[in-house]
Design a protein with these regions (language model features):
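Histidine-centered catalytic/metal-binding microenvironments
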Residues: 441-501
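Accessory, solvent-exposed terminal regions and/or long lumenal/extracellular loops of proteins
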Residues: 258-341, 345-347, 437-439, 448-449, ...
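A contiguous strand-loop segment
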Residues: 16-116, 136-290
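Short, well-ordered beta-strand elements within core beta-sheets of diverse protein domains
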Residues: 120-126
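Substrate-recognition/cap regions that form aromatic- and gly/pro-loop-enriched pockets
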Residues: 322-458
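Cleavable N-terminal signal peptides
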Residues: 2, 13-14
Length: 501
């Protein structure tokens, strides 16, 4: 029988996975940040926020991304950058996973203005570097209040990738406490609904940034009595539980282990939830530099061949059925005859609304510096289309014009239809139908064929994008506006061609 700590599984709103690659760990010298947005209420579509100039006194509306509630306004800046999904026109990328944390530090219901969704998109509209993004996220939450629970953010530009972990001050005060750690060159990071920052260097601004009161706030409100040097962010703000380890850190373990040559094998009992004192490193070195296709495979992972493999091939698991499927319907845990049982939580999962793998490349002009390889639905079975941070249009099948959950998201452009209505003009619904073929007893026969074809198309689109980038650079030197239109048309055509297949 599992302990009651299991029931404190994954706090917060969306149960997402991030994998973060420093430029020294990537095959082409780009930074790579990946994200699966996992929630049964998410219907994947791609947001576009065009660059704009704003008159003095302009205000920006703030919305709670999860609850679709209007939370207030903040002053707008004179100019906002182009934002496509989670990348902007100068190569900044932001991802997130919710860890929840202490209930008394939940930012909801305390008059705060900025939830994690609008914190991401407001920051992307203003930030030119990862460090500036972290400063903006700090400033916005201190000034206007952080209306969320605990979040882990991946924040990157073409030079650096940071893991920023942020907690609201909840009922005690307006603002946030946070620590940001730069991923060393040649290393990768990962997060999955459990805070990962423990103790941290407090005199190394090249590699670690933090809220000025991250320790003092805990002294004043949460009973911390230790030294500054011994302060443990996770222990104070999101204590590890069986559920946090088994459903969160287990995904980090399965993302780390293949790329670091088994370097976290010694932490298996931690990922199992059996030894919560055997914590994994925050970042690990790679044994081979990673390509985008390598990261595709990381984000497709179902813990195959590991102790956590739910397919039933290596050990009995009735949930795998005759097709040895790793997919499980909710809930993660259930009770039977007085005992609590669990399903494993894998990185690739059927309830993703969308997923992306984004690169930032400092050698390219700003409009194509960041490319967002975007896929609606399950990261395992969905091809990813290229969308650049400077694009000014979205392929028709991937935008809000083809459906969103009623009232869902930030209503910049209300959709004429809702996401609950099946729509064969929507990439989400087509990708979802294909993915469903691989579930249950059909998995062992259908899944290999689906991913083989996805990989063929992904390889083709990667090659197409490299050629487009060469052509863009040549055109950019002559006519910048024409180059942006050329790139935007490429994104539209590539997305719609993939949709029609």
């Amino acid at each position: 029988m599992l302990g009651l700590a299991l029931l404190a599984v994954v706090g917060g709103a969306r149960a997402c996975s991030n994998f973060l690659v420093s430029k020294g760990a990537s095959a082409d010298g780009s930074t790579i940040l990946s994200y699966t947005a996992d929630d049964l209420s998410l219907f994947g579509s791609l947001d576009l926020r065009l660059a704009a100039d704003h008159a003095p006194g302009s205000l920006r509306n703030m919305w709670d991304w999860d609850d679709q509630l209007f939370t207030g306004t903040i002053p707008e800046v004179p100019h906002t950058l182009n934002v496509v999904g989670n990348v902007n026109e100068v190569g900044v990328i932001i991802t997130e996973t919710t860890f929840g944390g202490r209930s008394d530090l939940d930012g909801h219901g305390h008059g705060n203005n900025i939830s994690y969704g609008d914190l991401i998109w407001t920051t992307l509209s203003r930030a030119h570097t990862a460090r500036e993004a972290i400063q903006i996220m700090d400033s916005l939450t201190q000034l206007y209040g952080y209306e969320s629970s605990g979040e882990s953010y991946g924040v990157g530009d073409s030079d650096e990738v940071w893991l920023l972990e942020m907690m609201s001050k909840g009922k005690y005060a307006r603002g946030s406490v946070w620590v940001a750690s730069r991923i060393p060159e040649g290393y990768v990071g990962a997060t999955a609904n459990q805070a990962r920052t423990t103790t941290f260097a407090q005199n190394d601004p090249d590699n670690v940034l933090f809220a000025k009161d991250v320790v003092q706030f805990a002294r004043d409100n949460l009973g911390y009595t230790g030294t500054d040097a011994d302060f443990n962010f996770r222990e104070m703000y999101d204590p590890i539980t069986f559920g946090g380890a088994r459903f969160g850190e287990q995904r980090v373990w399965t993302m780390f282990n293949p790329v670091c040559g088994g370097c976290v094998d010694a932490h298996l009992d931690f990922a199992q939830g059996y030894n919560l004192n055997n914590s994994m490193p925050l970042f690990v070195p790679v044994v081979k530099k990673l390509s985008v296709m390598d990261v595709v495979h990381v984000m497709r992972d179902h813990a195959e061949g590991t102790w956590f493999d739910p397919s039933g091939l290596d050990r009995p698991d009735v949930g795998g059925e005759s097709g040895h499927s790793p997919y499980r319907v909710r809930p993660l845990t259930w009770d039977f005859n007085g005992s609590t049982y669990l399903n494993e939580r894998t990185v690739g999962i059927q309830q993703s609304g969308w997923a992306f793998i984004a690169q930032s490349r400092g050698w390219l002009p700003p409009p194509i510096r960041a490319v967002n390889w975007f896929a609606p639905d399950d990261a395992s079975t969905s091809p990813r289309i290229p969308m650049y941070g400077g694009a000014t249009r979205i392929p028709a099948a991937f935008g809000h014009t083809v459906g969103q959950v009623p009232g869902g998201g930030v209503p910049y452009a209300p959709s004429p239809v809702d996401g609950f209505t099946m729509n064969l003009q929507s990439a989400f619904w087509i990708w979802n139908l294909v993915g469903n073929v691989a579930f249950s007893e059909r998995y062992s026969t259908a899944y290999p064929d689906i991913v083989a074809q996805v990989d063929v198309e992904q390889t083709r689109m990667l090659a197409d994008s490299l050629q487009m980038e060469k052509d863009f650079v040549a055109l950019w030197a002559v006519d910048e506006a024409a180059a942006v239109e050329f790139m935007t048309k490429f994104c539209e055509d590539e997305g719609m061609d993939m949709f029609k297949k």
